[in-house]
Amino acid sequence: MDRIINILKTLDRPGTDKVIEFMEENNYKGSRCYGHHKYAGGLVDHSLEVYDHMMQNRGKLPKDSIIVCAFFHDLGKASKSTRQIKDHEGRSVRLLDKCGFPLTAQERNAILTHHQIEGFLNDPLRKCLSQADIDSTGRWKEANDPNYNSSLSNILKNIGLKFISKLCKVFVSESYL
């Protein structure tokens, strides 16, 4: 958690201290994710994995936007409760608004829609966040199934993406970044 707080403190945006305070008061450090990183502290591990991946693959995207999306895309999952939070994407944005933390339109869109494929190709920040989230969560594990692999590969090929089953990743042309 210390690494996350140190990175967040590099942001020059109003409300950053309030967001950090929220994270500390609402067990961000001990929160878990559901479906992946299901252990106490899983949210921190997942967020750091997303951040590291986004930084390695950011192209010309602003570092501030990478920080915001990586650490706040699942902010809505932070809770003292052990129950699963519904609509964590919307809750994340509402919490940031409540803290007075300004988001760019691109950041807001990326956080709200990082689990959706619609519009994926049109927004480099969202694409970077979604890919990092996919890589960290291990989604699309079905790739080991040859039938699923073939079907998914054809679908992605039709929208300009390439699926590499061995790595369980979606690679997007560098020209979009």
Region locations from a protein language model:
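Metal-dependent phosphohydrolase cores
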Residues: 1-177
